[in-house]
């Protein structure tokens, strides 16, 4: 690990999500080129860009928060960065659903489903801004409820085909296992590889599975 990341308050968490932000940026470029090459319509292109933006937003906010040590930042600034970090989880979940809801689901049902998710995401962001010390389990349950919202529209999602469903399920499982680690604060394999660092790896894995689903089945 480079000296830059070793200076961070949480070196492993910072490094994993800093590289995640870089990967999300280039992944967004790949999705853009894929959409243009495939002649995707504007709805598909816009939905894919929303997904890419949500990835970049989450990983950038997370990397910045986990880099800045408390000795450098005042409590107020660090608290705001923490709020931003946690808030972006809602944005990522809604952003991950957007391509599938807007392109693969029948309309206008897909648009309504997408709108509901974004309304919940906005409510979650506002909740984080004004109730940052909410119980850990409360926000995690809301994350999981949003993440598995596809069960409410299963008939429409099941029509996308088994390969796409497997990628979506794999991503959802990665996020869900990470959420469990976050609630129980386990396992802690070493001083560097704590439950939080493992959570970051699982988020990266979940994002990759969903990126592949967008790349191969939406565009």
What are these regions (language model features)?
Residues 1-219:
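Multi-pass alpha-helical transmembrane bundles in non-GPCR membrane proteins
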